[in-house]
Amino acid sequence: MGPEAKFYNYFKKNTPNISYTRIENTSSLGTPDVLAYNKNNVFFTIEFKVTKSKKVRFSPHQIAFHVKHPINTFICIKTPDACGLRLYEGSRIRELVACGLELEACCLGLAACRLKLE
């Protein structure tokens, strides 16, 4: 199991009020990792990333997806710094590509991310 799959499993285990459907899609490149559904009856997608540096790698297809679908899309990044976890809105993907982890996240840490998404 790769680092992003491990991160997804950790996140899923620690957000029990969210229903997740893992998307394994080889025909539509750039589709986020999961389709999620919260207790407020809201669907959203999450792209999970793990980085050991301040840069986050995205494929051109992932960037295009978030540019085309800026609402209810999120990018959740496991980082090596003290906060450990950052959540960004998909609408900010171009800034995230350009600035990396210097870009201010909408949430820092698991508890804040859980509150935002639940």
Region roles according to the model:
Residues 1-25, 39:
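Acidic-basic catalytic patches of nuclease active cores, encompassing PD-(D/E)XK
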Residues 34-36, 42-52:
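Conserved catalytic cores of phosphodiester-cleaving nucleases, focusing on short active-site segments
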Residues 39-40, 51, 77-82:
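Short, flexible beta-strand-to-coil junctions
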Residues 52-69:
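Mg2+/Mn2+-dependent nuclease catalytic core
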Residues 68-92:
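Nucleic-acid nuclease catalytic cores
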Residues 98-99, 103-115:
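Long, intrinsically disordered low-complexity tandem-repeat segments
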